Amino acid sequence: MNLNATILGQAIAFVLFVLFCMKYVWPPLMAAIEKRQKEIADGLASAERAHKDLDLAKASATDQLKKAKAEAQVIIEQANKRRAQILDEAKTEAEQERTKIVAQAQAEIDAERKRAREELRKQVAILAVAGAEKIIERSVDEAANSDIVDKLVAEL
């Protein structure tokens, strides 16, 4: 056999093999490759969507956290204002109660002082009468004794 005929036979066999492969082997391989490329592309797209969704969820969570912090701050401020208001009201009530108690105590003191003065006046009057009786018993001079009694009464 001649080398040219062998090469020609091999070339024809190779061409037939290539045609056979292109007709029967290549399409299923290409279909499998395209299917795999599509799956990979879908997976990448899904991962990208998931990443975007994660970013949106993070942004949403951050916004909600900021809103919650702002609401908490508002609630704290309102509570502080209410606390201050309650303290002011309590101070005002305590001051009014103190004033009322002091006024009652002062009134009781004044009443007790008046009662003591009246009691003292009564006792002084009794003593004055007793002294006057003793003076009268010693001397019957009413003019001299009445001056003394008048002076005692004036002092009261």
Curated annotation (Swiss-Prot):
Molecular-function GO term, any one: proton-transporting ATP synthase activity, rotational mechanism
* Localization in the cell: Cell inner membrane
Spans traversing the lipid bilayer: 11-31
Entry GO CC: plasma membrane; proton-transporting ATP synthase complex
In Pfam terms, one family for this protein is ATP-synt_B
Membrane topology (UniProt): Single-pass membrane protein
From which domain of life does this come? Answer: Bacteria
Protein family:
Belongs to the ATPase B chain family.
The UniProt subunit note reads as follows:
F-type ATPases have 2 components, F(1) - the catalytic core - and F(0) - the membrane proton channel. F(1) has five subunits: alpha(3), beta(3), gamma(1), delta(1), epsilon(1). F(0) has three main subunits: a(1), b(2) and c(10-14). The alpha and beta chains form an alternating ring which encloses part of the gamma chain. F(1) is attached to F(0) by a central stalk formed by the gamma and epsilon chains, while a peripheral stalk is formed by the delta and b chains.
Q: Which protein, by its recorded name, is this?
A: ATP synthase subunit b
Whichever gene encodes this chain, its name is atpF
